[in-house]
């Protein structure tokens, strides 16, 4: 949803994190709730509102992140329809009990982070707008591109990590000696039934470092 002037080179390359503004905003919501909501939205620390009212504000002095913790709303119905792997401790629940066990928001701490890059902001916007209906993936061959600590929220489904709103490590789904949660059933189906292999036995075929790395991942 960014226009060209918002993502062109030299614009929004870095946006400062200003946690000291959080108390001022909270005070405004306590004393003047209607004025505050008109100015910064229903939840001032939700990613969509931070982008709309701060990062993309026409006022240059507002081009900051005014908190040390941002959040993304979780549409629980959409999440359950998506087929995402639920933490094992709530997998047995049904109906309203299951929905009640799912957090209302994904909270992302910015502690000790002084600024967010354009890449960070783009990732946050994609997560905020996917509504948890359309899966977002990161290839396992790609190194870390963001200082935001998302590793615990990844679930491996094959050669890709899927973004989720669950901190699987806290929920107890990351096994010993593992870095990420694994959706075993979906991974098995992808590797055994959906992936297509072949051609590596072609005489004289040259495998560059990128292709060879992918072969190692398959293995």
What positions do the PLM features span?
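ER/secretory pathway lumenal C-terminal domains and tails of membrane proteins involved
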Residues: 2-219
């Amino acid at each position: 949803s960014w226009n060209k002037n918002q993502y062109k080179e030299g614009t929004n390359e870095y946006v400062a994190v200003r946690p000291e503004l959080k108390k001022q905003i909270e005070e405004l919501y306590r004393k003047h709730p209607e004025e505050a909501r008109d100015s910064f939205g229903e939840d001032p620390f939700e990613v969509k509102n931070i982008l709309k009212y701060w990062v993309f504000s026409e006022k240059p002095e507002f081009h900051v992140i005014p908190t040390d913790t941002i959040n993304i709303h979780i549409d629980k119905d959409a999440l359950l329809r998506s087929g995402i792997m639920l933490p094992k401790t709530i997998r047995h629940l049904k109906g309203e009990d299951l929905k009640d066990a799912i957090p209302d928001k994904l909270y992302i701490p910015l502690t000790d982070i002084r600024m967010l890059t354009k890449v960070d902001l783009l990732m946050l916007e994609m997560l905020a707008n996917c509504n948890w209906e359309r899966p977002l993936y990161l290839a396992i061959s790609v190194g870390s591109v963001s200082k935001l600590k998302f590793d615990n929220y990844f679930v491996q489904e094959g050669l890709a990590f899927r973004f989720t709103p669950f901190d699987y490590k806290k929920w107890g789904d990351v096994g010993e000696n593992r870095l990420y949660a694994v959706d075993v059933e979906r991974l098995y189906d992808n590797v055994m039934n959906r992936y297509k292999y072949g051609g590596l036995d072609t005489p004289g075929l040259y495998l560059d470092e990128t292709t060879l790395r992918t072969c190692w991942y398959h293995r």
